[in-house]
Amino acid sequence: MDRISTETELNWEFVEPLNKNALSDLEERLEIGFSDEFKDFIKRSNYGFSQLRYFMVGNESYTFKHVLDFNLESLLIDFMQSLKEWLEPEEIVFANDGYGGYYLWNMTTDVVLFLDTDNGSKKALLNLNMFLKKLESRG
């Protein structure tokens, strides 16, 4: 079986180093547990902008602006609270498209979803591993 490389730090610009306890503090406050894959992604891309601004899933094109800042635990929780009408308890917002859309990760199903706050629609995209591969691929 081929190993999917996620050693792609060069695909992220303006990354803010993640504070030592940022993720564990957030997990504790939200009473959740992040997967190692999600933690690794946030560590290498925290508040970063993707060099790849657009990507395709099926016939749909998506814009990716940046990963949210996981160092600002209280602000992130407040922001998630402002989106609570669209979020399930097992979903966490982790990035945006710069146009009112947000990328969510469902921790139960391991699926990344796109939330369009203009019309309230939520669309399942890919499992986390495939989403990161698509987002961080250079090809």
Residue ranges with predicted function:
Residues 1-101:
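A surface-exposed partner-binding patch
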Residues 102-104, 123-124:
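Short helix/loop capping segments that flank catalytic or ligand/cofactor-binding pockets
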Residues 106-109:
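Short acidic-glycine loop/turn motifs at beta-strand connectors
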Residues 121-139:
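Compact, glycine/acidic-enriched structural inserts
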